[in-house]
């Protein structure tokens, strides 16, 4: 199976490397406006193939995306220290208006996976462009809060001393400052968080809850402050999403895709738990949040909707 990657910066290249390590697909086609960068990244990653899985990794043009089942779009400028994801919008929206039509011209049957930030708004923009070509919005998916959700689960598991794969917790809304940690819906081993913590002799006092919230919400800023970019975590998250799509795993992931309504906010793209498979988003499962979380999710949806309107989508 062919997978396209458009944008060979830190995120796109790291996602490609993660796919090789996981053995996702059979062929990776890397496309970038900087052709020398695409060739160099493809060559470097291909040298890891003998130590991992037998994938063909090449640099190419948009034409070579034809027949791809998934195209990862990681094109755009990066987030600067102190810059919010929404502040990136104007610059990256202009890039998307050039890139997305070229991708769809050659890979119109593919699922688009958007990674560029602000991912919620750019996914909405990509879906709008795709819609003009008759492509359903369910086949345009953003990485959403998949990485934030992983951070949340990891911190909870550390506090409980268990494997994070057995913690079911979700971060919802914008992938950014207004995201919502769904504390009221957390379960561990089939039990509500408080009940499981009590059995373990642990607790989540307000101070610990606030600390976890801060760490999840501000992780990217702290990483960017120290090394100018984030890419290992999101690269791994993207490789996982692509694997789910390529092999039709039918996994519940907090990706983002255009939704008709969220908490009274219409026509908005934010992260909720979605059933994801070979043709993109198959179904949406809004969680049963408490009152404060619902208000926070409504606020997050409004923020993203306002950003969408700012680029006239």
Curated annotation (Swiss-Prot):
> According to its UniProt record, which residues of this chain constitute the active site?
175
Which positions in this protein are listed as binding substrate? 79, 85, 117-120, 148-151, 230
Q: Where in the cell is it found?
A: Cytoplasm
Write down the InterPro entries for this protein, in alphabetical order. L-lactate/malate_DH, L-lactate_DH, L-lactate_DH_AS, Lactate/malate_DH_C, Lactate/malate_DH_N, Lactate_DH/Glyco_Ohase_4_C, NAD(P)-bd_dom_sf
* Residues carrying Phosphotyrosine: 221
Describe how its activity is regulated.
Allosterically activated by fructose 1,6-bisphosphate (FBP).
Keyword annotations: Allosteric enzyme, Cytoplasm, NAD, Oxidoreductase, Phosphoprotein
Q: Which cysteines are joined by disulfide bonds?
A: none
Q: What is its EC number?
A: 1.1.1.27
Task: Provide the catalytic activity annotation.
Answer: (S)-lactate + NAD(+) = pyruvate + NADH + H(+)
State the pathway, as annotated in the record.
Fermentation; pyruvate fermentation to lactate; (S)-lactate from pyruvate: step 1/1
The protein's matches in Pfam families, at most eight in alphabetical order, are given as: Ldh_1_C, Ldh_1_N
Question: Where, in this chain's numbering, is beta-D-fructose 1,6-bisphosphate bound?
Answer: 153, 168
Q: Which residue ranges run through the membrane?
A: none
Q: Which family does it belong to?
A: Belongs to the LDH/MDH superfamily. LDH family.
Biological role stated in the UniProt entry: Catalyzes the conversion of lactate to pyruvate.
Subunit details for this protein? Homotetramer.
- The molecule here is called L-lactate dehydrogenase
What is the taxonomic lineage of the source species? Bacteria, Pseudomonadati, Thermodesulfobacteriota, Desulfuromonadia, Geobacterales
């Amino acid at each position: 199976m062919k997978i396209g990657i458009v944008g060979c910066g830190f995120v796109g290249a790291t996602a490609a490397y993660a796919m090789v390590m996981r053995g996702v697909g059979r062929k990776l086609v890397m496309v970038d406006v900087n052709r020398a960068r695409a060739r160099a990244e493809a060559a470097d990653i291909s040298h890891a193939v003998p130590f991992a899985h037998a994938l063909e990794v090449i640099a190419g043009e948009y034409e070579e995306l034809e027949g791809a089942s998934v195209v990862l779009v990681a094109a755009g400028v990066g987030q600067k220290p102190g810059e919010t994801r929404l502040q990136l919008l104007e610059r990256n929206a202009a890039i998307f208006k050039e890139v997305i039509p070229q991708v769809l011209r050659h890979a119109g049957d593919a699922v688009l996976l958007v990674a560029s930030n602000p991912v919620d708004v750019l996914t909405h923009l990509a879906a709008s462009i795709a819609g003009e070509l008759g492509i359903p919005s369910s086949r345009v998916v953003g990485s959403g809060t998949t990485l934030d959700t992983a951070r949340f689960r990891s911190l909870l598991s550390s506090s409980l001393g268990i494997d994070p794969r057995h913690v079911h917790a979700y971060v919802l809304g914008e992938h950014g400052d207004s995201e919502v940690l769904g504390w009221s819906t957390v379960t561990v081993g089939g039990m509500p968080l408080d009940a499981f913590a009590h059995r373990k002799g642990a607790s989540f006092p307000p101070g610990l809850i606030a600390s976890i919230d801060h760490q999840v919400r501000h992780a990217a800023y702290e990483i960017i402050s120290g090394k100018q970019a984030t890419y290992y975590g999101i690269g791994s998250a993207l490789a996982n999403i692509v694997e789910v799509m390529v092999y039709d795993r039918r996994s519940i992931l907090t990706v983002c895709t255009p939704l008709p309504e969220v908490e009274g906010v219409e026509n908005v793209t934010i992260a909720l738990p979605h059933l994801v498979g070979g043709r993109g988003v198959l179904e949406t499962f809004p969680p049963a949040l408490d009152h404060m979380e619902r208000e926070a999710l409504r606020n997050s949806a409004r923020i993203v909707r306002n950003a969408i309107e700012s680029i006239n989508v």
